[in-house]
A protein has these predicted regions:
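Acidic, proline/glycine-enriched N-terminal capping motif
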Residues: 1-70
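Catalytic strand-loop segment that frames the active site of acyl-thioester-processing enzymes
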Residues: 14-21, 199-226
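Short, conserved charged micro-motifs
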Residues: 36-41, 91-95, 126-131, 174-182, ...
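Helix-rich terminal scaffold detector
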Residues: 194, 203, 211, 327-332
Length: 332
């Protein structure tokens, strides 16, 4: 994982917010097939794999029996087969869960990590660039379709409204490369993982290894707001804790935004993570994005620290803000 204390120049930020940027990554990718693939995965994922029907893209997580996130995942449903895109940090844990819970006669897992690539199309003009490229687009948000066939097929997906990207493409590297070139020819700027994480921070989206830790519960990192959990589907591993929090209680900490408003003489201290309210430590900074002396960040903070509160974060004064960010916090 790259350093999640990011610094971008203004042109790069403007491309992310108002243009189109394409970033090619190499996450863990799994394909689950078999007559019981959908049913088995429905019992593992926090999101509802069945309700959206064939051709759906959804976001969710696999949990421990006590409800903590093991890994998050983007899930692509096509017929009775499911493709899952998982952070590299979650690969080993995902394989362990699949090996322990999926009966081979019903659901078979193929690890495509290293062979498959994912291209993320970021920015407000992402959809326009996809349309101009001639690659083809699904029928609507949260839907997928395939380009090509057989071993060279690439899945193209339009993101749900809250996602930190406009579209994504998943497929073998040899098939994905010419499609990425078409996106660039249509106006997308080639980017890297810093752009990918900057878009995630702007959207208030958590990532494994930063906002999501070993004991993180889905509701602590905005899974309700970003469509990562269903309260109407059947049982799944860890559901009891998730449902109890939703219907009867609340979390003690939540993912919130931080805004260093540029009135301090120095940028936030990259060596400090503590968020202080008076003399009390109330949370920690997990990701930061700085542009021309201004900065925003994601922090996991005690729930009683409301948006609008002034805190000391990274050794500098900051304001707690609701997520996602409005979009103008980094403006000059």
């Amino acid at each position: 994982m790259p350093d999640l204390d990011l610094t971008l120049d203004r042109a790069r930020l403007d491309a992310l917010r108002h243009g189109a940027v394409v970033v090619e990554t190499r996450p863990a990718v799994f394909r689950v097939t078999g007559s019981g693939a959908l049913t088995c995965l429905q019992g593992l994922l926090t999101s509802d794999l069945l309700a959206p029907g064939d051709g759906a893209l959804l976001y969710g997580a696999m949990l421990t029996p006590k409800g903590a996130i093991v890994t998050d995942a983007w899930v692509f449903r096509r017929g009775d087969a499911v493709t899952m895109v998982v952070p590299c940090e979650g690969r080993a844990a995902a394989l362990e869960i699949f090996g322990r819970t999926l009966p081979p006669r019903l659901a078979r897992t193929t690890d495509l990590t290293g062979e498959a690539r994912v291209a993320w199309l970021l920015g407000d003009r992402g959809f326009q660039v996809l349309a101009k490229s001639g690659i083809g687009a699904p029928e609507g948000a949260g839907r997928i379709h395939e380009v090509g066939s057989g071993d060279g097929a690439v899945t193209v997906a339009l993101a749900p409204e809250t996602a930190p990207f406009a579209a994504c493409l998943v497929g073998p590297a040899s098939a994905l490369e010419p499609l990425v070139a078409r996106l660039v020819a249509a106006g997308a700027r080639p980017g890297d993982e810093q752009d990918h994480h900057a878009a995630r921070i702007l959207a208030g989206w958590p990532t494994l290894g930063a906002e999501i830790e070993e004991r993180t519960l889905p509701q602590e990192v905005r899974f309700d707001a970003i469509g990562g959990v269903s309260y109407t589907k059947g049982c799944y591993t860890g559901q009891e804790t998730v449902a109890r929090l939703h219907f009867r209680g609340h979390t003690n900490r939540e993912l919130r935004g931080l805004w260093w408003r540029g009135d301090e003489p120095e940028a936030p201290n990259g060596g400090s993570r503590a968020v202080m309210s008076g003399e009390r430590e109330v949370g920690s900074v997990r990701s930061r994005l700085a542009v021309a002396g201004r900065a925003i960040g994601l922090a996991v903070i005690r729930r009683e620290i409301d948006p609008g509160a002034e805190v000391i974060a990274g050794g500098r004064r900051a304001m707690v803000v609701a997520l996602p960010f409005r979009g103008d916090e980094l403006d000059a």
